[in-house]
Amino acid sequence: MASIQTRRDFLKVLGNGVMVSAVLPSFLASCASKGTEAGEGHRMVNMYDDDKNYLVAQLKRFTHVHQQMQKSDRMRCEIECMKIQYPLMFCEVEPGDLFAGRAKYPPVCLSPQAFDSGGYCISVGAMSKLESDPELSAEARADVREMIGYWSQESSRARMRKVFPPKMAEVLYSDNWTSDPLCGAPLDRLSGTQCDYDKLCRLGIDGLRKEIESCLSSGKGTPENIEFWKSSLIALDLFSEMALWYAGHVAEMVEKASGIRKAELKKIEESLRHIAVAKPETLHEAIQLVFLWAVMSGSINYGRMDEYLGDLYVNDLAAKRITEEDAIAMLSSLWTLIDSRKTTWDARVIVGGKGRRNETAADKFAYVAMETTKRVRGVIPQFTLRFSSGQDPRLYETALDVIGTGNPYPMLYNDDVIIPAVMNAFRVPYEEAVNYLPFGCGEYILYHRSVGTPSGVINLAQILSLTLHKGVNFTTGRREGIPSERYDGMQTFDDIMRCYKENVEHYVEQLAYHEKLEYDTIGCEAPYFYLSLLFDDCISRGKPVFDGGVRYLGGTLEAYGNTNTADSFAAIRKLVCDEKKLTLDQMVKILDADFEGYEKERMWMLDAPKYGNDDDYADALRVEVDSHICGFTREMAQKAGMHSYLIVIINNNANVTMGEQTPATPDGRKAYTFLANANASTGGADKNGITAYLNSIVKPDITIHAGAVQNMAFSKETFNTYREKTKALLSAYFGNGGAQAMINCMGRGDLQAAMEHPERYQNLIVRVGGFSAKFVDLPRSTQLEILSRTLY
């Protein structure tokens, strides 16, 4: 065998089918003779194993690279860190897996979204646990302590906090929204990316390389552009190295396997070797390529899967390489791998809708994907169907059949309504808006054209409480929000609404500036190559995704408590202004007592008009609350320096978490209990039936935000026995402007029974808000919130 001197030699030999163990000694000897570290920085034959001293040594090397390079050469820093990270991150192929790619982030890593942060991240909890591991040597333990100290100051999140302007630091004084009673809080992450996996499957690694080389040979570009293109080629080499490294490990498993499992592992090995150098030619190769790229990039959503896998699926069927059952087996394994990443609030897989380049083939894939979802019946991926009046109606019918089995998927998105809404909200033409995709809990993004990380939360019910207490946080006694003189003479309904709106704007303004600051700091600390190479227009511009590369740089802000706030205004108007049963001071006193001794007055508040009953007295106030915050937030985009900045009215259990920090509200809600879910009515408040409820939830303007979600709960008896009536009901809802529906379909009494006998309901999956979960795994407070919802 020829001498192996360089990484290129190493890749070439692995590409010819040689196992890692056969060539690693020669490569390591070459590195040692040159005075470099073994394997140019990582132990190639080791995955994330139980050797904690080795893990610490690699984390120390990762930290050293960051210390030496990040401020002077961010592009090389990312590549060198990823060389160390990927062998620590990727795990062995487990029994039953049909693809490689299980992964777990090491406790210090680079990712757009890890450990509730983005960029260069640390899990202090995991590092502290590592420090106490009895197997660690004294030297390794000291290294861990030193790294905790370093990263507490030099993580991307910590470095961003150091450059908060004074007003931002004052207004956004805490990000601990899960336990502090905050009106608004920043989130530090770069989430919601939707990579162009169709381009990846059409071009492969070699095609991407040729596109970059074409830019380099054009003779155009600044020195910074040229550096980006050259570094991108190195990043592609690193991806190929990773795939071949993985293939070598799988080859060793092949040698030990037999029968069907041997053939399965051999196919994994062959796909890994193929995608390292060429575009995928089969469904198996494409799935393997996409999943590995997703893990390397840190992206946790999976785009329009029917578009990028549809052609290969159809071709495989035509060539008799696979059957439909083979495809279902592959997708079942993929669904399991997606679930293994534990990205509960993301993991979107999209099928259907307008704008696909290969609708016929894509639809055929969509059917097999729905069948897989029906059989696997998992919490994730968050399987989503886009539909329109012009597409094959059988897709929608099949979706209802799957939902009728008690599966919360697919979620339904109405293109006929959403595309025009996105055109207005994002200020883009139809050709761009047709590529909208929901990610995460329901936020819209323009597929591989825009980013819009939700990097802030705002609690409107908390802001109303602050307003009623004239700038004093009831729970903490802290004075915050607008200046106290703005409350002078606050007595009328219009006065209260004015002060409330000024407070909302006070927080939204700083959250918008924070979003842009996040892009300018965390977003610019690394080029995030594996995102940049699959986002328009990073390669052509020669710039990283968050640093001038992406076509549309946007942001989103998560709003909570909209319904409680609107219903509270309805109670104030009715009881204080119209009927004069209470003065404003009396109402505030009752709220401060959490209704203790004021049961009659609480019933007045509970009986006041509520959103969700097709009653314009309440619904008009919900429209006003939404229109104000959505409109003001949308106008902050240009001031903050982004293409878009939009509210999202979604839910990721934050209605429960933030409600537990929110005092009593005038809608009759008790202190420190859950808030209403997203665009839905307060649980049990929709008393006029399903038609009235659906008429209410289409009233807020959907053309000024980036997505709102609504849950609907049907009994299996209603949904299945009266299917034609249910279809007519949903058809009327979507025809009246309904954008989206997440449907829970369950037997009457199932939820209560599951709380009493959880062992009997281990497979009861429910739609919580922006995510699904096994009902028995949810906290009791969340179970109670779901139980409060009306079951039709």
Could you describe each region identified by the protein language model?
Residues 37-229, 260-267, 279-792:
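Conserved catalytic cores of very large enzyme subunits
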Residues 2-5, 35-39:
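Generic start-of-chain signal for non-secretory N-termini
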Residues 230-241:
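Extended non-globular scaffold/tether segments
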Residues 250-264:
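Short, Lys/Glu-rich amphipathic helical modules
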Residues 3, 9-32:
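N-terminal export signals
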Residues 272-280:
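Extracytoplasmic/secretory soluble proteins
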Residues 205-219, 243-254, 272:
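Non-transmembrane amphipathic alpha-helical segments
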